[in-house]
Regions:
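ABC ATPase nucleotide-binding domain
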Residues: 5, 27, 63, 345-347
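The feature captures the beta-strand-to-loop junction immediately N-terminal to the Walker
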Residues: 37-39
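Helix-to-loop junction immediately C-terminal to a conserved catalytic motif
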Residues: 52
Length: 370
């Protein structure tokens, strides 16, 4: 079955000046829904094209189902490819698009007909078999593209931003349909996206990429709850970032980070030294907020500068007493609302604070999405 191994793969363009994939190694397990996630230009689509055989690596090896495929053409790799732009034949109806692969492979007509019907019933479009692509909605066209990719019998499905051209509500519905389909058919899927909500909802595991490199691989919960890299804390979910120094290292894996103007926060963790400059990250939804100024351990005073009602949540923009700005998100059902200009106390739970070495090029550069 099609597990995929990428071993020390590098790909550069412009005579080596642009390194799109930089010494990447990955192991995608059999029957796994795996996503490559990152901002535009991070190398995720290039890596997918390398796995597909559409381009060749400069260095490294790619294995599909235990077979080295560096020199194997795309049509012999046993893959199905789904593009953001659907890539349907505009002059063919839905039926001919879906059964194109079996016909090219010269399968028996009975088998091609059976597969075509099964695939279209699976994506709930058998009744539109005689429609041409321009008569279909975007969601329908993507389901046709998926059926076509599966009709040739591929067990490895490669999806390049498959939901990117669809509107928000259709994306939400189709991503669950897509995962269910992959799991029901026991496929291996590699899904490229820049949408972290899409990746976390649909994936068994995710590789977060930036500037051609894989920063962290893990399931959605691991990446959210335990980011190993500062950019992962930024790109998966949302985080507030504050600068400081380690002012004290205590026993029991505790230390103190001193923020601007000497404001202390106790943090859990290890591996940091007194005097070290660090950046801390904390999720807006992990912060606590109370009315008035009540000095408690791991709390800072602040003033509400902005309030945004977002349905299930309320988003507060707060200026802390040292001038730093943060965001606090609280469930609207708590019915504990705060107004702009109100003085508040913000609690920072020690176990919810992530600490990272301060980036050499600065925080802004390290968190940039380009």
């Amino acid at each position: 079955m099609p597990e995929v191994k990428v071993m020390n793969v590098t790909k550069a363009f412009a005579k080596g000046k642009i390194v799109a994939v930089d010494n990447v190694s990955l192991h995608i397990r059999d029957k796994e829904y795996f996503s490559l996630l990152g901002p535009s230009g991070c190398g995720k689509t290039t890596l997918l094209r390398l796995i597909a055989g559409l381009i060749q690596p400069d260095e490294g090896e790619i294995y599909i189902g235990g077979r080295l495929v560096n020199d194997v053409p795309p049509e012999d790799r046993g893959i199905g490819f789904v593009f953001q732009t659907y890539a349907l034949f505009p002059h063919m109806d839905v039926w001919d698009n879906v059964t194109y692969g079996p016909r090219v492979k010269a399968w028996e007509e009975d088998k091609s007909t059976r597969i075509g019907r099964e695939m279209l019933e699976m994506v709930r479009l058998y009744e539109r078999a005689d429609a041409v692509p321009h008569e279909l909605s975007g969601g329908m066209m993507q389901r046709v593209a998926l059926a076509r990719a599966l009709a040739a019998g591929a067990k490895l499905l490669l999806l390049d931003e498959p939901l990117g051209a669809l509107d928000a509500k259709i994306r939400l519905t189709l991503r669950y349909d897509l995962r269910k389909l992959v799991k029901d058919l026991e496929l291996t899927a590699i899904h490229v996206t820049h949408d972290q909500a899409e990746a976390t909802a649909i994936s068994d595991r995710i590789a977060v990429m930036r500037k051609g490199r894989v920063l962290q691989v893990g399931n959605p919960q691991e990446l959210y709850m335990n980011p190993k890299h500062i950019f992962v804390a930024h790109f998966i979910g949302e985080s507030n970032f504050l600068e400081g120094y380690v002012s004290e290292v205590r026993e029991k894996k505790e230390f103190v980070v001193e923020l601007r103007q000497g404001l202390p926060l106790q943090v859990l963790g290890k591996g940091h030294k007194t005097g070290e400059k660090v950046a801390i990250a904390v999720r807006p939804e992990a912060l606590e907020i109370k009315k008035g100024k009540v000095r408690k351990p791991n709390s800072l005073f602040g003033e509400v500068e902005g309030v945004q009602f977002e349905g299930t949540d309320i988003r507060y923009e707060i200026k802390l007493e040292n001038g730093d700005h943060i965001v606090v998100v609280r469930p609207s059902l708590l019915m504990e609302w705060f107004s702009a200009g109100e003085k508040v106390t913000v609690g920072f739970p020690a176990e919810k604070i992530f600490v990272f070495p301060y980036p050499l090029k600065g925080l802004r550069e390290e968190l940039a999405l380009e």
